[in-house]
């Protein structure tokens, strides 16, 4: 089935998930919406995030997608279940995938969750981690400056390094062996985060596990694209197309992308 896979996020962070889907499923077409005009979602109310997520999902439903991936942890926490109940196609989130990746890797069951305020407040990661291993010690840390840093496109250089180190200061005297990047923007900062927490710590994104989930779901439903299909990805941003283009083309390394402005209602 050669219909596209829909991927949604508050901004450019979901591109980290899209990249893994493209790598794992090279014949699949991605239709991506980044709500860059209203990013970040972390400080917003649950109702606002739910409404915005539904707007993106409905826009992609009209484009006849075969699956939706909510590539945003904050949106997954508040909207996944309602979308799964009401959409005519499978809907995947990123939180369970991130928790699974961490439980597989941690040796000491001491896990840091770096995320937005909204995701931390939701308690969704704690619930997912403890459902997999009740002895997991979880250290949640909201990093509200990280998403605006990535969205600005200025995430390399000395200023970014200082900002990231400052955001991670509360971890200084904590004991942990694994860090979950509980926001899909954060893998773009992964090298800087690894430099702060140390090379002996596992720093994990949910992107790879989410792409694996997508592949398994499509295979189970018999809706994988034909092996000879040439994908035709489309990207939509509610905010600045040039800024989105700069980040997306740099991160995805897919050449010139088809990127358009979209208005959500």
Curated annotation (Swiss-Prot):
Family, as annotated: Belongs to the aspartate/glutamate racemases family.
Source species of the chain: Lysinibacillus sphaericus (strain C3-41)
Keyword Iron: no
Pfam family, any one: Asp_Glu_race
Listed InterPro entries: Asp/Glu/hydantoin_racemase, Asp/Glu_race, Asp/Glu_racemase_AS_1, Asp/Glu_racemase_AS_2, Glu_race
Binding positions for substrate per the UniProt entry: 9-10, 41-42, 73-74, 184-185
Protein name per UniProt: Glutamate racemase
One record GO biological process: regulation of cell shape
